[in-house]
Amino acid sequence: MIKCNVTINGTVSRAATVRTNSEGQTFICFGVKTTIPAKSGAGKQVEISVSMDGGESDTNPYAVGTKVEMRGTLTFRKRSDNLYLNFHADAVDFTPASDKDNIEGDIEFRGTIGKQVEEKTDKKGGKYLVFSAFSTEKDGDAFAFTWVRFIRFSAEREAFLVPK
């Protein structure tokens, strides 16, 4: 399981619609595009499916092209070779503090550490750890594996940082 408590700045890319869950409660769904910066400067644009509590009267401000800052929980779902980003918003601000697209927050990861935990040294002599881990999710009768590459900016190893 990969779950992130984050703040996302982005642009509404799909108009809000109202849906009803299996318990009869209504919620709003819309899409947001944001850019994840790359070292080269180009960045990668991602589409995030957003849901939040609300009804028909709450859909008006979510027009395509509107800049938003949202706080909530981001989860990842892998179906075959596709990775989907789903976000449940607790709060949405239509006057974001920054116009820059970004995702900031904390990640909660439950999974298995890969075969290597490497200690490396940066240009200034500081030590850090690099390792990969995967999370498993059941997709029908099969299992889907999502690999994540971690960089820990400290050479300190906790007991759980043991390669498989």
Where are the regions that the model predicts?
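Single-stranded nucleic acid-binding surfaces, predominantly the OB-fold ssDNA-binding core
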Residues: 1-164
